[in-house]
Amino acid sequence: MQQKQRFTNVTLVTPSGEEDKDLLIEGDKIAQILNRNENLSDDWKIIDGHNNYIFPGMIDVLQHGFMNYLYGHAEENCTVDNAKLLPSVGVTGFLPSTPCLPPETTGDFLNALSNDIDKAKEGARVLGIHSEGPCFALAGAHDPKNLRNPSIPLAEELLEASQGKLKAVTLAPEMDGSEHFIKRLKKDNISIHLGHSGANPIDVPKFADWGVDAVTHMYDALPTYPADDTGVHVLSLTDALIAESRIALGLICDGIHVHPQLVELLSHLPTDRVFLETDSVKGAGSPTPVKFEFFPGRWCTVEKGKASTYNGLLAGSSLTSIEALQNYYKFSKKSLSQVAIAASLVPAKVIGLDNIMGSIAKNKLADFIILNKDNLEIEETFISGKSVYQNEQ
């Protein structure tokens, strides 16, 4: 018999606003949203929410690592262990993300990562793989030796090696071969993200026609232009991406990658246009500094709220999803409902899972977090209606 739970004395954060109502969970799904004074049969377990928020579980679609693991190292149990830890920072679903991999080992690596995902049975849902690269025009912190040109054979290699788990690919769509590469991936419903690109802004609508539907870390590794000789603002790639309504913009909301005022600017777009992603690396979530090798010869340090190389180049982030939530709420000055759309619903939509997760709504999976109303800290995390993390402080 399925467990029946009634969460009362809570404020539900839904896409339409904050609602002082009860949440009914039956088994692993949300059964109903109910007025507080409505009566039910007595077989429902009553849970007092202590006047806290119920917020949808967060979905991180760009995550290179967390705590002791970098997914680019393909260590055994990397996703198994992190799936158990991520609910502590509000994550109920994530895409372990890969950097630009050596061409000769890409297939073996993706196979190994896919096999590890198969073993992840507890904690946050491992929703698939995000291949950040290898088709970049601008390497950023990635190994430039591993950059490759897009092609149909490469698309098929990524699809086969990931064993059906590929959910998103980031590329620079101005590269030769991109159109056919993108269209091949779209046949398998892969989300295509523009990133590490120096594309001509005029071409953005064409890229959307091909199937580009999102941007990886908006404003980062996307060069802009100075004013021309007459003082006129020159259309930059980021301007064109803002203007293209078919593309959702991924945002690393740590106050370092994107200035808070730019975060506020993006928050004025329609709510389906912005989503939060961490781009976190090994050491994110750690209370002490962590040093690791991103690729042979490229050492990175995670400390003081950022991840960087020895010469100061940003190399992902140390951001956690709960910090991203808190920062977006602070920087955007928007409602908690709009924050939830960016943290949960739009990421789910980007990877085609918004019909079953991403918001507090009837018939969706009961993946949610209890947020303290005073400080927006996590009190408890639920996945499939079961408590998987409790804040003991």
List the predicted regions and their residue ranges.
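N-terminal metal-binding scaffold of metallo-dependent hydrolase/deaminase domains
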Residues: 1-41, 382
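Conserved, mostly hydrophobic/aromatic
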Residues: 131, 185, 215, 328, ...
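Active-site core of metal-dependent hydrolases
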Residues: 156, 160-287
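His/Asp/Glu-enriched, well-ordered alpha-helical/loop segment
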Residues: 233-249, 267-278, 284-364, 368-371
